[in-house]
Amino acid sequence: MRLNIFIMVDIHRIVSGNVNCYIVADNDKAILIDTGRKKYREKILEKCKDFHVSLIVLTHGHMDHCQNAAYLASALQIPIAMSEKDMNMIPDNRKQSLSAKTFLGKIVLSVSLSSFEKDSLEMFEPTIYLNNGDDLSGYGIDAKIVELPGHTKGSIGVKIEDNLFVGDALMNMFYPTISMLYTDEREMLKSAKYISELGEISIYFGHGKPKRNRKWVK
């Protein structure tokens, strides 16, 4: 699925259950943002083969976003990039505790914690540790990394033109909202406020369809 409003790069949303991965392409280069769950790895790999994907960017360390990172990196022979602040989650997603306040958030939290108990991640070592302001143009896409802590300590966004890929810093599972789950509520709200202040951009969520930016917090 593409959202073609205010877009010059090609953005391809790969729906993998309730999780999104994105291929962002510009001419003959592309990056993959998040990798989805194991169940969907072949679907995602086949889509990647339609492009010259040169880099995997993980928005954070939760397994629904990075369970296929090792597999896809090996299959495509490309590096993985993420924040070092989430590396403690790769062997065990329970290493960063999560909280929720809303009724729906508590349901999502319960499902997530059950998944953390039952599922596992194939270990991987990122080639690149990302920090705020890092430039990905060396991989063919004019993208900047934006730190968006709160959902996890190492949550990041990827800003490309007037588009921001936010991972789970914001969510659109049931409706567009701030993150329903967070490691640090104060940091999560600060990140949501920062996104609000970016103005007229398109938001690409880790869960749900893209939306135009809005005021996420007062």
Question: Model-found features: residue ranges?
Answer:
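Metallo-beta-lactamase
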Residues: 135, 141-216
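Divalent metal-coordination and catalytic microenvironments
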Residues: 24, 34, 44, 60, ...
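Residue-level marker for buried hydrophobic side chains located in beta-strands
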Residues: 31-33, 57, 80, 165, ...
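Soluble, non-transmembrane catalytic domains of enzymes that act on hydrophobic metabolites at membranes
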Residues: 52-75, 132, 146, 181, ...
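Short, acidic/turn-prone active-site loops that include or flank metal/cofactor-
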Residues: 37-38, 84-88, 170-171
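Conserved beta-strand hairpin/beta-sheet module of binuclear metal-dependent hydrolase folds
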Residues: 2-51, 157-169
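Active-site HxH/HxHxD metal-binding segment of metal-dependent hydrolases
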Residues: 46-128
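Soluble or luminal CAZymes and related metallo-dependent hydrolases
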Residues: 40, 128, 183-187
